[in-house]
């Protein structure tokens, strides 16, 4: 599983010119799901996301989490994070999870995040326009793969 986490002052996602998700201060998270991922990876990633300390404290040090600042998350499914261009110029997505299973795991991630902070989401399988104001900019990539 792979997360691209961007600290934002605001973000929104549109499908067919309709806003389907919108947040203020928090994270825009691009979520890539690998074909071998399970809820075990998802739980690890959500825990890491909630504890990640990239918001400034009173001394302007990145020391606060999304929960500390009562921030929001906009979660965007993005299978292209597992695009492999090692052998070709056209990406292969063979490492990405199949859509039906990936959608279930994406929804699981959304529900688990929502239990902790206000969470909005993109539309799985749709062509989306994502707008954000990246604050800092701060962008963190988090990856986790368990060896079974």
Swiss-Prot record:
HAMAP family: Deacylase_Dtd (MF_00518). It comes from Methanosphaera stadtmanae (strain ATCC 43021 / DSM 3091 / JCM 11832 / MCB-3). InterPro entries: Daa-tRNA_deacyls_DTD, DTD-like_sf. Belongs to the DTD family. An aminoacyl-tRNA editing enzyme that deacylates mischarged D-aminoacyl-tRNAs. Also deacylates mischarged glycyl-tRNA(Ala), protecting cells against glycine mischarging by AlaRS. Acts via tRNA-based rather than protein-based catalysis; rejects L-amino acids rather than detecting D-amino acids in the active site. By recycling D-aminoacyl-tRNA to D-amino acids and free tRNA molecules, this enzyme counteracts the toxicity associated with the formation of D-aminoacyl-tRNA entities in vivo and helps enforce protein L-homochirality. GO terms for cellular component: cytoplasm. It comes from the Archaea. GO terms for biological process: D-amino acid catabolic process. The keyword tRNA-binding applies. This is D-aminoacyl-tRNA deacylase. It is found in: Cytoplasm. GO terms for molecular function: D-tyrosyl-tRNA(Tyr) deacylase activity; Gly-tRNA(Ala) deacylase activity; Ser(Gly)-tRNA(Ala) hydrolase activity; tRNA binding. Homodimer. Its EC number is 3.1.1.96. A Gly-cisPro motif from one monomer fits into the active site of the other monomer to allow specific chiral rejection of L-amino acids. Gene3D superfamilies: D-tyrosyl-tRNA(Tyr) deacylase. It catalyses: glycyl-tRNA(Ala) + H2O = tRNA(Ala) + glycine + H(+); a D-aminoacyl-tRNA + H2O = a tRNA + a D-alpha-amino acid + H(+). Keywords: Cytoplasm, Hydrolase, RNA-binding, tRNA-binding. A motif (Gly-cisPro motif, important for rejection of L-amino acids) lies at residues 136-137. The keyword Ligase does not apply.
């Amino acid at each position: 599983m792979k997360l691209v986490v961007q600290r934002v002052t605001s973000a929104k996602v549109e499908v067919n010119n309709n806003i389907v998700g919108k947040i203020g201060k928090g994270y825009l998270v691009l979520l890539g799901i690998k074909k071998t991922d399970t809820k075990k990876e998802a739980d690890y990633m959500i825990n890491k996301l909630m504890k990640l300390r990239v918001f400034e404290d009173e001394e302007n040090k990145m020391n606060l989490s999304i929960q500390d600042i009562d921030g929001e998350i906009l979660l965007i499914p993005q299978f292209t994070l597992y695009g492999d261009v090692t052998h070709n110029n056209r990406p292969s997505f063979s490492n990405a999870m199949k859509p039906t299973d990936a959608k279930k795991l994406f929804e699981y991630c959304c529900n688990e995040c929502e239990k902790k902070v206000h969470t909005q989401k993109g539309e799985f399988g749709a062509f989306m326009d994502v707008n954000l104001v990246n604050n800092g900019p701060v962008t963190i990539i988090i990856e986790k793969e368990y060896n079974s």
